[in-house]
UniProtKB/Swiss-Prot annotation:
Keywords: Amino-acid biosynthesis, Arginine biosynthesis, ATP-binding, Cytoplasm, Ligase, Nucleotide-binding. It comes from Clostridium tetani (strain Massachusetts / E88). This is Argininosuccinate synthase. GO terms for cellular component: cytoplasm. CDD domains: ASS (cd01999). ATP binds at residues 9-17, 117.
């Protein structure tokens, strides 16, 4: 009799590695491991071998880097989306894409189940399951961390040893690490006590600023309607562009934040995020927008950037609201074209010049000299009208 199938979101890490024997033992399902490559820098052949060795009947490795950067990272970039003003959404943006790919493979394989290794306290369980439901609500979810008796990473390591599963962590130094082409996140371990400064030895993408290059690096980034297309005059693919900026930013100590964030599930958590290339792109994009967007549009867009960040963080990527915000953002980006030069030095990013034909800045108007469009005398009438509410309030308070 043919067994039913389960599609497992597989990384080769601790959680998903022990899930394979657990699924076979508790559900008697054929496990199809799926690794979505969004730039983790893992050896995918080794990941495949490990999945098979651990008990998977089949392994898919899907190269989704180009789609991830073009359709997720660059959309968030155009919106300047951040969560709680700091988090650049590295994990949040990857999960909807992974959910979409998992459903596609489940349909291809005729699998009724999808399994993920997200903990019952984290955001990713919501992101995966909302994403999956957006494409096929009939698929059944198996979430081991909400079911099994394993309560900690230490327990998980013990279970792995019991089942003969090799894992790349130890009980002495346990971090939860998520990596893709946009960022690397670090959680757990001593980070769980906010009194502790984080250990910079954990960095994998960024050189600590004090150890970074002693000479500044200059980089030119060309944007076409809000989308980065060239570095130092050379047009390159989105993946190559982000990889290049990751290297440049990392060498100059750029792009690390240590934050306490409000999780979707209601608790606070602390994370250290390395996002060198993304940090450079966001700074350059905002600099270009400061010249090319009018005040009303810029301020409205800044308000909506927070909402966009919340939508992405909460796993609501496949929603009408996100699509509607993208439509608004695309209109605002019509004139966001030009080259931004940045100076990078020991963790700092400084504007070193902007070249655009669409600048709304006019030196003749902004300077103290005479202008046909603006007379110094014009300010007097404007100030009288602008200050009228303040004058009325003062009179009423007498």
């Amino acid at each position: 009799m043919t067994k039913e199938k389960v599609v497992l979101a597989y990384s080769g890490g601790l959680d998903t590695s022990i899930i394979i024997p657990w699924l076979k033992e508790n559900y008697d399902l054929d496990v199809i491991a799926v690794c979505i490559d969004v730039g983790q820098d893992d050896d995918m052949e080794e990941v495949k071998k490990k999945a098979i060795k651990t008990g998977a009947v089949k392994v898919y490795v899907e190269d989704a880097k180009e789609e991830f950067v073009k359709d997720y990272v660059f959309k968030a970039l155009k919106a300047n989306a951040l969560y709680e003003e700091k988090y650049m959404l590295g994990t949040s943006l990857a999960r909807p894409l992974m959910a979409k790919k998992l459903v596609e493979i489940a349909h291809k394989e005729g699998a009724k189940y999808i399994c993920h290794g997200c903990t019952g306290k984290g955001n990713d369980q919501v992101r995966f399951e909302v994403g999956i439901a957006s494409f096929d609500p009939s698929i059944k979810i198996i979430a081991p961390w909400r079911i099994w008796d394993i309560k900690s990473r230490e327990d998980a390591i013990d279970y792995a040893k019991e089942k003969g599963v090799e894992v790349p962590v130890t009980k002495k130094k346990i971090y939860s690490v998520d990596k893709n082409i946009l960022h690397t996140s670090h959680e757990g371990g001593e980070l769980e006590d906010p009194k502790n400064a984080h250990n910079k030895e954990m960095y994998s993408m960024v050189t600590p600023p004090e150890k970074a290059k002693d000479e500044p690096t200059y980089v030119d980034i060309y944007f076409n309607k809000g989308v980065p297309e060239k570095i130092n005059g050379k047009e390159i693919s989105p993946v190559e562009l982000l990889n290049t900026l990751n290297k440049i930013g990392g060498e100059n100590g750029v792009g690390v934040v240590d934050i306490v964030e409000n999780r979707l599930v209601g608790m606070k958590s602390r994370g250290v995020y390395e996002t060198p290339g993304g940090t450079i792109l966001y700074e350059a994009h905002k600099d270009l927008e400061s010249l090319t967007l009018d005040k009303l549009t810029l301020h409205c867009k800044q308000e909506l950037a927070q909402k966009y960040g919340e939508i992405a963080y909460d796993g609501l990527w496949f929603t009408t609201l996100r699509e509607s915000l993208d439509a608004f953002v695309d209109v605002t980006q019509e004139n966001v074209t030009g080259t931004v030069k940045l100076k990078l030095y020991k963790g700092n990013i400084m504007n070193a010049g902007i070249d655009t034909k669409n600048a709304l800045y006019d030196e003749g108007i902004s300077s103290f000299g005479a202008s046909e469009l603006y007379s110094h005398k014009d300010a007097e009438g404007f100030i009288k009208l602008f200050s009228l509410p303040s004058k009325i309030k003062a009179l009423k308070n007498k």
